[in-house]
Amino acid sequence: YKTNSELKSMWGESFNTYYEKVKKAVMATKGEVMMYNGKYIDALYFSTSNGRTEDPIYVWNYSAPYLKSVDSKWDIGTKFFNATKTIPISELNQKLGVNINSVNDIQIKSQTTGGRVNSIIIGGKEFTGVNVRMLLGLRSSDFTVAENGSNIVFTTKGWGHGVGMSQYGANEMAKAGYNYSQILKHYYTGITIVKK
């Protein structure tokens, strides 16, 4: 939740335009809720996908029938889709508690259904992609690694945990003509939108 003063600071001169859009969307959907089998859903969301959303089993070790990995091709090419982060090998060793000398000491073992790193071996120690993302401050657990001198370069796709609705994907879907109901039902599999 953001206060009006926080929104004014964030949006600057565009505050009135954006605020009216938000207000219009809220009023148009007033009283509507998303449900799955008669129960309210946990409407998780994140910034930008890598082209697919993620199943929460890989992120938080739980599952929900409406939070399945789905295609989100609309994110490809958006401003937060790709990023790189360069980390000195010495810093990587310290943050992960390993002792590697080169990128050859890093091996991606498996990927998730959403195309992110599931299991990775770094200096003989096994990590999940989510752990590496959190420990190294990466935008996403969909990453590749390369070496540049005494640094490891992580190239990521997407931004966030990847579970639920992609904000940038939803925005691009809206620009392509999808309505809010179609967008929500795409990202939250099998839900109904009910007026309460």
Regions found by a protein language model. Name each.
Residues 1-196:
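Conserved, single-site charged/polar hotspot
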